Amino acid sequence: MRPNKDRRTEIILYGLLLIPLLFAAAALAQATEQAQGLAEITAALSVILNNPAMLRWCASTPKFLLAVLVLYPLAVYCYMLDQADRHPGAEHGTAKWGNAHTLNLKYRNAKQPAENYILTENVRFSTDSHAHKHNLNIIVIGGSGSGKTRFYVKPNALQLIGSYLFLDPKGELTRTLGRIMETKGISVTVLDLVHFQGHYNPMAYLETDEDAIKLAFAIVNNTKPKDATSGGDKFWDDSSVLLISALILYLMYEAPASEQNFSTLMYMILNCQVSENEMVENPLMMLFGELERRDQQHPAVLQFKSFMLGAKKTLQSILISAAANLYMFNSRKFAEMTSRDEMFLPRMGLEQRALFIVLPDNDTTFNFIATMLYTQLFDQLFRLADSTPEYNGALPVHVRLMMDEFANVALPKNFKNILAVCRSRNISCDIILQNIAQLKSLFKDDWEGIIGNCDTLLYLGGNEYGTYEYLSKILGKETERTKSQSIGKGSRGSSSDSLQTAGRELCMPDEIRRMRDDECLLLMRSEDPVIDKKYNLLHHPNVKYTPDAGGEPYVMPPDYMGDAVTITMDAVAAATAPEITEEMYEQLDYLEKHPEENYYENEENFSQYDQGD
């Protein structure tokens, strides 16, 4: 595409050219009146042009001037119209390499160097998105061993800008960054899903009925097998959501804070055995019956009545399905971890905090906890920014999510929309991937929308052809001059040379593959791409406080409690739920294979409560 030229400049230049043309027209008019014949007219015109003082107004001067004023603009218009469709030197593309130092001068915060993101060795990116009109969402792509943590995550964490959430496989970031962040006055909280240390209770953040239903959906959707997509599975999922949301709403409105946790939830499910005898009520039915007598429109009652529309056999199967969704809470350590909360998610937008979520790199069983935390963090921060008038819709402290292992943790269903609007709330996301294939697998047809909501892409290297091909394509084509030569042999030999233009990718896929290990490729919206050195971690002034430069690592004490809270788990909630029996699983399996027995006594009534996806 041809760069847009300033048409005003062109028009001014053509207008200035009109002045000598009008003078020449007036001179020609005078010459035609003074002389006869072409030779004499030419001689007279030459004399007048060489001596402008001799120019005089004559009878034919207006005609000549009018002709110029009509024909000249018409000629200029035709010429500009013709040139508009020509792209000299850019017939095949205008892609070209940018300069890292030029890019840095444009986007850095020179007055406050600490208020910059570190992209490459020579490029800094100001956190003031209003100054450069770019969002702060960044996609980082790099294969295993390309240095995503060393060359990008750690240097940016050491900038100590605002609050951070880290997904931390194996706990490396916690050990490296925890001590310096505490030293610099940043509150450090760790949720360790490897050693089950720290405490996070999703029920601590329930404020509305919608929050409770959303949490129930998150539990069911993130604890089922990834390949569970059949219609029967949807039936069980929706039914489980009805039951779990009813129980969560009951705890939210009726239980003390110490009992609002997953252990109590599991305990309630296991005390809801449905009998074939309709005259026999289980403890849970009695509990909700008492609540209904007090308030028939209680949200928990409405959800529970929707669940109870099912046939007895079906209800028992749904109970088993719901218990299966919560089976991990049978673990004493996991039940204890979720018994109370010390994450204090809204505070991340009010004061500098660092939250490390330590994940096992070889087991994704408990990664759904990170998913729920993601969902609730976005909800809490958006709500805080939007509901506090003095914040004007933006959090006072910037919150940055460093989403390593992005592909291994399920995301909120509306993540694409969150990414599009988080900038206005002073939130940014660093999406860290191994290759483009991971993004395509996660978002199917919407994967390009994720990249579209990130104004910066940093490629650190890898060994996946699809990524090479994608990058080569978006880098564009340049126009090259080629020289062709032909030589004719024989008694009358001849040769000819010709210059032509041809298009070539700015960087071919194989050239991207051969990038040096210490180089990276940076693409920013509206800017030419840059190849620069990866940032050297040892050049950062704060690295001396980390184990990478001989500093002391951060070690979580065995009795780690984070920001200690006073609530304790109720005796009922502390009880370890019994294991789900093999007989219960067999019954559920039988009903899944015989869907004709899975029915609600009143399908029309049930349909109005179907929550859908």
What are the roles of these predicted feature ranges?
Residues 419-521:
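Conserved ATP-driven motor cores of ASCE-family P-loop NTPases powering translocation/secretion/packaging/pilus
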Residues 96-105, 114-115, 119-130, 150-151, ...:
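A broad, low-specificity signal for short, low-complexity segments enriched in glycine/proline
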Residues 505, 544-547:
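Extended alpha-helical interface modules used as scaffolds for assembling large macromolecular complexes
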Residues 1-146, 150-152, 477, 488-489, ...:
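Basic- and hydrophobic-enriched, low-structure N-terminal and domain-boundary segments
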Residues 359, 363, 405, 433, ...:
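Short loop or secondary-structure boundary microenvironments that flank
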Residues 180-182, 205-206, 445-449, 473-478, ...:
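Short secondary-structure boundary/capping segments
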Residues 261, 339, 390-391, 439, ...:
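Flexible domain-boundary/linker segments
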Residues 23-26, 134-427, 442, 452, ...:
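P-loop NTPase motor domains
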